[in-house]
């Protein structure tokens, strides 16, 4: 075998992050909902905002997620918007009572998570927000895709 040149991991990470950012496409933007405006109050719906899927199962579960930032974490860092803290608190309380189901290993992982029911009261309360973000997700792996 010939000589191997060591790879500069950070160079490839930077390129992968650039490709991911440039690969995001907004397909539809009715009523100019995006970008969010400075001062907007945002209601975030969906338990997956709190427990996002960073990769698939099986071999995909071994993906290095050093640079992964969840949607809710990123929104919390955004200084120009405020989040509907009442709604977040409602989700946090519900999640305490309905913990994330991690399953029991290969082939015994739930393909979706239990979601909080949106009562009329919750929806009415969130109507005070300027925008809503609904986060949905389900997992997939080598033994099943959804």
What does each of the following model-derived ranges do?
Residues 1-146:
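C-terminal non-catalytic regions of proteins with extracellular/luminal or membrane-system context
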């Amino acid at each position: 075998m010939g000589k191997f040149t060591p790879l500069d991991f950070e160079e490839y990470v930077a390129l992968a992050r650039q490709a991911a950012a440039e690969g995001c496409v907004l397909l539809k933007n009715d009523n100019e909902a995006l970008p969010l405006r400075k001062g907007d109050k945002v209601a975030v719906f969906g338990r997956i905002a709190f427990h996002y899927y960073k990769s698939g199962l099986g071999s995909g579960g071994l993906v290095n997620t050093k640079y992964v930032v969840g949607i809710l974490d990123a929104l919390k860092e955004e200084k120009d918007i405020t989040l509907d803290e009442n709604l977040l608190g409602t989700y946090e309380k519900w999640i305490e009572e309905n913990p994330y189901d991690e399953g029991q290993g290969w082939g015994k992982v739930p393909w979706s998570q239990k979601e909080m029911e949106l009562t009329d009261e919750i929806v009415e309360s969130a109507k005070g927000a300027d925008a809503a973000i609904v986060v949905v997700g389900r997992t997939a792996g080598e033994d099943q895709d959804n």
